[in-house]
């Protein structure tokens, strides 16, 4: 039995700050508006594991696992933020945005995310 794939179209309003560029001075103002509801997101970074059939135990596989969790509205805002960055037109070859003080698994604000557009 195969799963049936469904398609759902969504409409987004993308929000940006007005750009101002002075290449000679290295000034690039403007960019993507910060996502809302950051306080409802958690990013957990931990060792990754895989199940070993012989020992019937989970063992570290040498990689890291990133778990992102949050409320529906926080995850939607994070997705919209990433699409905003992808769609943002800039002359800045090193354009990036920061999301700061995202909570980790213990609820403390300790994860800062930098998203770079290449």
Please report, for each region that a protein language model flagged, where it lies by residue.
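Positively charged, low-complexity terminal tracts
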Residues: 1-118
């Amino acid at each position: 039995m195969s799963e049936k794939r469904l398609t759902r179209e969504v409409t987004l309003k993308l929000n940006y700050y007005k750009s101002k560029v002075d290449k000679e001075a290295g000034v690039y103002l403007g960019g993507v508006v910060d996502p809302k509801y950051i306080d409802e997101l958690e990013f957990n970074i931990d060792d990754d594991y895989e199940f070993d059939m012989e020992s019937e135990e989970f063992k570290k596989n040498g990689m890291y696992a990133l778990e992102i969790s949050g409320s529906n509205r926080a995850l939607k805002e994070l997705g919209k933020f990433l699409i905003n960055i992808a769609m943002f037109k800039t002359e800045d070859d090193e354009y990036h945005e920061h999301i700061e003080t995202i909570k980790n698994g213990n609820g403390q604000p300790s994860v800062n995310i930098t998203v770079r557009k290449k």
